[in-house]
């Protein structure tokens, strides 16, 4: 049986501050580092081994992966970093407090910006210092590839080619794969794997630092999926994510 593990990074400082993070390169909190280490312990206890790991180019995901691999004594395996696994870009909302934004625009509008499939937040200008076009890690990209804002549909459009061209072929070869990414880039992949509708994806929340395991058939179609760890803690973590955008 093929198993794929997805992991959202541990709590970041801007998760703690309840701010829209997007492509801003913020680090983990102490709690986030503990979450990452605990994820590694859970994976060890469940008997997982990995041959290759994929991660975004943002430090909160990279550091999470480091902690996981350290706990698993797998620091030596190949790691592929790619911008297509980045969090969705939150445009002009990036850096703003979610609750304060909800007070200004209303809970319903913020929920649409956070969780709808095809409604992006207001865009940045390219002159805005929050636009990542001058960041060296994106130097190989055309300016039009560096987003001014993104909805989940945009995130799906950039993530899935990397899945089909790079990750899925490795899984099909029998390699054990770990993907460490972000709430919305993982929502994009889960939407594809589970065939979730554009309407129902609004209700999907992925908690920080808890491994999500997919059991796949030979065609990489899901047979089942489940989170590792205590289910009460899982529910609390999911509910906390769901409540972040409320006034």
Curated annotation (Swiss-Prot):
UniProt-listed Pfam families: His_Phos_1
UniProt keywords, alphabetically: Gluconeogenesis, Glycolysis, Isomerase
Binding site for substrate: 8-15, 21-22, 60, 87-90, 98, 114-115, 183-184
Pathway linked to the protein: Carbohydrate degradation; glycolysis; pyruvate from D-glyceraldehyde 3-phosphate: step 3/5
Domain of life: Bacteria
One GO molecular-function entry: phosphoglycerate mutase activity
GO biological process terms held by the UniProt record: gluconeogenesis; glycolytic process
E.C. no: 5.4.2.11
UniProt key word Cell inner membrane: no
Cited SUPFAM superfamilies: Phosphoglycerate mutase-like
Family per similarity comment: Belongs to the phosphoglycerate mutase family. BPG-dependent PGAM subfamily.
Name the UniProt record assigns to this protein: 2,3-bisphosphoglycerate-dependent phosphoglycerate mutase
Protein source organism: Chlorobium phaeovibrioides (strain DSM 265 / 1930) (Prosthecochloris vibrioformis (strain DSM 265))
Gene name per UniProt: gpmA
